Amino acid sequence: MPEKLNTSARRATVTRTTKETDITATIDLDGSGTGNISSGVLFLDHMLTNFSRHSGIDITLDCKGDTEVDDHHSVEDIALVLGSAFLQSLGSKTGIQRYGWAMIPMDETLARCAVDLGGRSYCVFSAEFKRPAILGFSTEMVEHFFVSLSRTMQANIHLAIMEGKNTHHMIEAMFKAFAYAMKMAVAVTGKELPSTKGTL
């Protein structure tokens, strides 16, 4: 797949163009939590803006996709691009916390997330949503988003709803839990690579 990468400090820009989507995303791990999101899927815009604000990670994202067909291609490809941008912005990973975790309440909902940025792509997702879609965003794509993200980010992501009824609250709490887990995991807390293997 065509992909262009530019990195400096803890910042990366990734561009991916296919016959289904044209996406450019910039990640700044040491930003101020500013999200400029145009995904073509309104509810995903809302979720990624929330993620940016609560993680403190700046995200600029523009996606032109075939949403007249479905939201699947855009949501999946955005996750793949963001994962690549996260991985590139982490660089050698020297000094990072590596692990992060959070539990986030939102009214009746409680979401849990744990992240390992150790180079092992694996996602465990546990949630059932009553509504099939919100503002053009298919709720079945929430799991697919995080599975795709974990693949290109080379990260282990565990996400679960512990309690919840309202679909909006459940999805938003999951994105916020992921935000706080990532905020912890990407934090620079030392000078050594957080692995006994000598590589991540």
Swiss-Prot record:
Signal peptide: none annotated. Pfam families: IGPD. InterPro entries: IGPD_sf, ImidazoleglycerolP_deHydtase, ImidazoleglycerP_deHydtase_CS, Ribosomal_Su5_D2-typ_SF. The keyword Nucleotide-binding does not apply. Pathway: Amino-acid biosynthesis; L-histidine biosynthesis; L-histidine from 5-phospho-alpha-D-ribose 1-diphosphate: step 6/9. Keywords: Amino-acid biosynthesis, Cytoplasm, Histidine biosynthesis, Lyase. One of its GO terms (biological process) is L-histidine biosynthetic process. The keyword Amino-acid biosynthesis applies. It catalyses: D-erythro-1-(imidazol-4-yl)glycerol 3-phosphate = 3-(imidazol-4-yl)-2-oxopropyl phosphate + H2O. Its EC number is 4.2.1.19. It comes from the Bacteria. PROSITE patterns: IGP_DEHYDRATASE_1 (PS00954), IGP_DEHYDRATASE_2 (PS00955). It is an enzyme of class 4 (lyase). One of its GO terms (cellular component) is cytoplasm. GO terms for molecular function: imidazoleglycerol-phosphate dehydratase activity. It is found in: Cytoplasm. Its main location: cytoplasm. NCBIfam families: PRK00951.2-1, PRK00951.2-4. Belongs to the imidazoleglycerol-phosphate dehydratase family. This is Imidazoleglycerol-phosphate dehydratase. It comes from Chlorobium limicola (strain DSM 245 / NBRC 103803 / 6330).
